[in-house]
Amino acid sequence: MATLRQGVNRNIGRILGTLRAEWQQLYNRYFGHIEHLEGDAKEICEQIVDRLWEGDFYRTSLGHFDFFWMRDFGTVAESLVKTGHKKHVLHTLKWALLQYRNSATVTTCIDKSGNCFNAPMHAVDTLPWLLHCLVVSDYDLNKSERKFLEHELRKYCRRYLDTTGHVRPIEFAEMRDAVI
């Protein structure tokens, strides 16, 4: 159960994170420039991965989505581990779990300041992607992280799954890349 402080922080984080994302998107669309990187495909990929490392976490983009998105990180975590970036993957997960515990919920996004928010809204795949990342990175949960995730799993089952284990017919964010 979230404390009053956590609830206030969560709401402030949600508002600030969403406003920042929208501002960055508009600014980059109309005033940004396209950067070109030198090298072959492998060298360009290495430059991008290195530049996405924020010091505490992997951000999703060099552009306007320059904060942590659980879904995007989940899709690349295994590849990052296999290409020698396991240390940064583990550090990202530790950082994300700390932010999630501080806000008392798992969300789709976390900004640089640690504000957790759902953009554009809650998503049914956020917690599963987090669990996937923990497995593929062989992350060793501490006691408080395990307790937090057990609570989040119970909350997830109540919110998203019916008594048969199927996803409830409710509205939630979807992966826009999959929409034709």
Show which residues each predicted segment covers.
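Low-complexity, Ser/Thr/Pro/Gly-enriched N-terminal "stalk/linker" regions
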Residues: 2-68, 90-91, 95
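Aromatic-rich carbohydrate-recognition surfaces in CAZymes
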Residues: 66-73, 77-165, 175-179
